[in-house]
Amino acid sequence: MDKRFWICGILVSIAALLLDFVVHGLLLQGDYNALVASGIMRSPEDASHYMPYMVAAHLLIGFGLTWLYRKGIDSGKPNIAQGLRFGAAVAVMATIPGYLIYYAVQPLPAALVHKQMILSTIAMLLLGMLLAWLNPGRKAL
């Protein structure tokens, strides 16, 4: 684990947290607020007490994605294509199934789950491209 790994892990963690804020805190805020009264979702005030868990989760996401991506770099292929491939693979293996599982065990509206899957897949593709840009296959850092 070199310096690039640590820098990349931190940057991807921050990017993941920011993308999730855009997706869940801004774009889906209205959908979530409609579920607060039923007790399915926490109110924004209650959710703020759990921010340390969100930070910890995004650190795990950032460093986990960095570790996996760096193990599978193919130096013979364009970086952005590799990043998109990686982001798509993670979305198919973890992001989309995670929301399908939540839908099966929680009474969430189907429209919300579709939005979550689409927006989170786009976020994962962006994280894949960021990983590709930060890890161009050379040892500059």
Indicate residue ranges for each PLM-predicted region.
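Juxtamembrane/disordered regions of integral membrane proteins
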Residues: 1-141
